[in-house]
């Protein structure tokens, strides 16, 4: 992995918001245009009564930081409540899932390193997705029982 040279300024208008593949959560990748191979950073805007994937990483640590609202998160067998401007560092191999069981949007900044290059566009190898999704990634936490997410459009 090579380090970038100099710096990259990222303005809010540079961000491209799109729904995530599995759970349709709006997100914007801060570093996709920088070419960084060492770190990843995304904004995730969780709508009310929604959840992101239940997953883990092979070698990446992730720092979850709540920018707006009150964050809720499953880490292993625990459910955490993270206040605005609070954060959680999660190591690799630890199953995790951010979710929103409130009636308001929650905005997260999630930063991970090292970047897992096998997921980058143009990767030469096929990734074994069972390594990051050892269980059904779309399963919702008990706090969202009876909720359908992602919603059918």
Regions found by a protein language model. Name each.
Residues 1-39, 53, 123-153:
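A short, N-terminal "cap"/entry segment at the start of jelly-roll beta-barrel domains
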